[in-house]
Amino acid sequence: MLSHRLTLTVSLTLCYTPLAWTEDTPQAQLSNLLRRVNTMSATVQQLIVESDGAVLEESSIQMHVMKPDGFYWETLEPFPELVVTNGAVLWNYQPDLEQVVIENWDSSRAELAAELLSGRTDSLAEEYEIHIEKDIGEDMAVFQLLPLDQNSLYRRINISFDNTALLSIHLDSKNGQKTLWQFNQPQINQQLPPDLFNFQIPTGIDIVDNRVSQD
């Protein structure tokens, strides 16, 4: 399945009207920012920092999202890897290993990223205490999610919007590790080919098929 870092990234999106603070709950405001987007493409810069401040990893990523469950996350540098799902099957392709791992995709078991990707944010209030910072600028919004589960890997999750655009996601782990995703050059509601989310397996590579029959 997706790594913990990957399952808590990605799929936040944009809306088409400027931010306007209302009496809505933070959960409702976050949902409003997500619900109007059907597709999103962006380049993502990933930075992972250890508890002592040392940089563990810097990555360049290409991301495509298509509701309800299309997800494409390709790490370009430093180590090529592709994770893609069409909502039924998940492929994890590692070209350096000449291997693809295939699994069932079950959005009901997915973590935060899949909920946000599909716009299913209703359960967020059951899993997180959601706050919003309103004092950082007229066109800025930062949502802070505090896990209610004491066994969560994360201390907090910050989701930042700049006016109508998703700016970044910041994960603060309990072990002191911090992960930052910076979203650049977003393209919203542009047509994406459905085949983008169906991985075509190259010839000559190893196939590890972990799918379980749904019958």
What do the PLM-derived regions correspond to, one by one?
Residues 16-17:
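N-terminal signal peptide c-region/cleavage motif recognized by signal peptidases
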